[in-house]
Amino acid sequence: MRLSQLSHPNELHGLAISELEDVACQIRERHLQVVSTSGGHLGPGLGVVELTIALYQTLDLDVDKVIWDVGHQAYPHKLLTGRYNRFDSLRQQKGVAGYLKRTESKFDHFGAGHASTSISAALGMAIARDRKGEDYKCVAVIGDGALTGGMALEAINHAGHLPKTPLLVVLNDNDMSISPPVGALSTYLNRMRHSPPVQFISDSVQESVKNLPFMGDAMQEEFKSLTGSVRRLAVPSVGAVFEELGFTYMGPVDGHDIAELTRTFNAAHKVGGPVMVHVATTKGKGYPYAEADQVGYHAQSSFDLTTGKSIPSKTPKPPSFSKVFGQTLVKLCEQDSKIVGITAAMAEGTALNLLQKAIPDQYVDVGIAEQHAVTLAGGMACEGIKPVVAIYSTFLQRAYDQLIHDIGIQNLPVTFVLDRAGIVGADGPTHQGQYDISYLRCIPNFTVMAPKDESELQQMLVTCINHNGPSALRIPRGSGEGAALMEEGWESLEIGKAETIEEGENLLIIGYGSMVFPAIKTAAILKEFGVNCTVINARFIRPLDEDTIHEAAKRIGKVVTMEEGTLLGGFGSAVVESFNDNDIFVPTLRIGIPDKLVDHATPQQSKESLGLTPEMMADQIRNKFNFN
C-alpha cells in the first residue's frame, strides 16, 4: 500500500506484517523529508512509527479515540489520518499544525501542546462514554518524560479507582523527554526497559478451565485469584507500582516489532478496566544521526538529510536572548555559590544546559513539574539560597497558584526568567507567550520587568537576583539586538525607573520589552510625516514609572503603548489604569495582541497578521490621531 493513497487509518486492517513494515518505512521517509526541509519535531515521531501503526490496526478509528500527549510524537498519526498530501505545509501559516488541533481533523480528539494531559482527557472521555451507555475504546499515548508530570500521576491515581472503566494507557518509553528525564520514576522505568516482559495466562487456558466438567465455573474465581498472585510475583517493580494503583500492566514490549505490539494491544483491549502497556522505543529510530543525538534531534530547523547538519542562516545573527541569559547566569554563579538555576525539563531551550555543564552543583532539573519547580524555589529562598527559575512563559501558566500562594503572598526572593515571551511562531497557540504580562502584574509583591535588548537583560538579571522579593523578567524567542555585552561588573537597575530614549513634542510612545526597538522604528517612520515622538522604554510594569510617564503624557497629550502580549490586562491596560487613577485624561492607543489566538506561522507573519510591524503600527497611529 502506498501511504499517499491511504484515505483512512482503518485501511491498515488486514494488512500483512510485511505490508505494515513497508508503511512504516514510508512514514519515516515522508517524516524526514518534510522536517529536513521546513523544520519541526524529528526524534519523537520517528520513535513511534510502529507503535502507531500497530495500535491503529487494532482499533476502529471511526469510533475509538486516541489521545496523544504533547503532540511531539503525533506526526505519524497525522500521516495516517489524511494529512499526507498536505504534510509539506507542516508548521507553516495555514498549513498542518505541529501539534494536535480538534479543528484540523476528526481524528485529533483532544488538542495538545503541553505535557501530561492525555490520561486525564482520555479518562474523561471514558467516563462520559460509560455514562452515555456507548461502546468505544479510549486510549492515551504518553511518553515517559510526560509521565513524570504531576497531572499524569493524578490521572493514573483516579483511573485506578475505576476498575470497571476500560481505559488503555500506552507508555511510550524512549528514556527521554526533550532531554534525559529525571527522577525516581524515570530510574524505575529505565530498569524496566531491560526486564523480561510479563507473560499473561492466555484466553485459551482460561477457557479450558471454564469448560472442566463439574468444577469449571466454580474454579473461575480461584483462577482469577491465582492469576493475580502469579502476576504479583512476575511483574517487576515498576509494573507492580501500576498494578497497585489499579492498572493491569503489560510489558515492556519492543516498540519497533509490529507483530508483538499488535498482539499486546489486542490482549489489552480484552482486559477491561484500566490497562498500562509499557512500550520501549528508540527516539529518532531509523535515522542514525537522530538516534545518536537524541537531544539535538528532538526538534530541528531545516537540515541536510545526508549529513544531518543544520542548514546555516544566510545572514549572521547575534546570540539569542536565551544564550545571553545562560552565559550571564554561569558567570554570576561563579561569583556567588548561593545562586541556583532551576529548570523544568527545558535545559536546552532556556540555555540552563550551559550552567549544567559549567557548575552542575548549582543546577537543578525537576522534570516536567512546573508547580514543584516554583515551590521548590520558594523553599530554597526561605533558607538563603538565591533560586533563578528559567521557564517558558507558556509553561509557567501551569504553576499560577504556586506563584501567588507560595511566592507572592510570602514575598520570597525568587527570580523567574520567562523565556519565549511574546510571539513564538510555528508552535502555534499552545506555545505563544502572550499572557504572562497580564498574569504576573496582578500578583502581590512581584516586581515585573522586560529588557529592550540583551545588555539590559544582563542588568535586569542582576537586579532580580539582588532584589529582596519575588521578581520576573520576560525575554523573547530568537536573536538579540546586537547590543554590546559586559563580561562582569553589572549593576542593578533602579527598580521602577523607565528610560527616555527620544524626545519629541507630538506623540508619546511607550514600549515594553521586545517592543522598544519597534517603537523606535515606528517613531522614525512617523517623523517622515512631521510627527516628532518621545519614546520611552518602560522597563518595568510593576512598579510602573508613573512620574516619568505621567509627566510626558500630560505635556504631549497623545499616547501610544506597545507590547508583545495580550491587550487584556496587559501593559497598555496598566498605563491606562494609572492615567485614570490619577485623573490624566489623554487619548491613548494600545497596540498589542488582541483577544484572539495566534496560530502557527513565522513570527514575522504573525506580527503582520496582528498589525505589529513598525509600518503597520505607524498607519494605526496616523489614523487614530489624524496625523496626515
Swiss-Prot record:
An example Gene Ontology CC term for this record: cytosol
Gene Ontology biological-process entries: 1-deoxy-D-xylulose 5-phosphate biosynthetic process; isopentenyl diphosphate biosynthetic process, methylerythritol 4-phosphate pathway; terpenoid biosynthetic process; thiamine biosynthetic process
Cofactor(s) listed in the protein's UniProt record: Mg(2+); thiamine diphosphate
This protein's UniProt keywords: Isoprene biosynthesis, Magnesium, Metal-binding, Thiamine biosynthesis, Thiamine pyrophosphate, Transferase
Entry-linked Gene3D superfamilies: 3.40.50.920, 3.40.50.970
Binding site residues for Mg(2+): 144, 174
A family per Pfam: Transket_pyr
Binding locations of thiamine diphosphate: 72, 113-115, 145-146, 174, 287, 370
UniProt xrefs under SUPFAM superfamilies: Thiamin diphosphate-binding fold (THDP-binding), TK C-terminal domain-like
Listed EC numbers: 2.2.1.7
Pathway of action: Metabolic intermediate biosynthesis; 1-deoxy-D-xylulose 5-phosphate biosynthesis; 1-deoxy-D-xylulose 5-phosphate from D-glyceraldehyde 3-phosphate and pyruvate: step 1/1
InterPro entries found in the cross-reference section: Dxylulose-5-P_synthase, THDP-binding, Transketo_C/PFOR_II, Transketolase-like_Pyr-bd, Transketolase_BS, Transketolase_C, Transketolase_CS
Catalysed transformations (reactions): D-glyceraldehyde 3-phosphate + pyruvate + H(+) = 1-deoxy-D-xylulose 5-phosphate + CO2
Gene Ontology molecular functions: 1-deoxy-D-xylulose-5-phosphate synthase activity; magnesium ion binding; thiamine pyrophosphate binding
Keyword Magnesium (UniProt): yes
Free-text comment on the cofactor: Binds 1 Mg(2+) ion per subunit. Binds 1 thiamine pyrophosphate per subunit.
PANTHER family the record matches: 1-D-DEOXYXYLULOSE 5-PHOSPHATE SYNTHASE-RELATED (PTHR43322), 1-DEOXY-D-XYLULOSE-5-PHOSPHATE SYNTHASE, CHLOROPLASTIC (PTHR43322:SF5)
Alphabetical list of HAMAP family matching this protein: DXP_synth
Quaternary context: Homodimer.
Family per similarity comment: Belongs to the transketolase family. DXPS subfamily.
Main function: Catalyzes the acyloin condensation reaction between C atoms 2 and 3 of pyruvate and glyceraldehyde 3-phosphate to yield 1-deoxy-D-xylulose-5-phosphate (DXP).
Protein name as catalogued: 1-deoxy-D-xylulose-5-phosphate synthase
Taxonomic source organism: Prochlorococcus marinus (strain NATL1A)
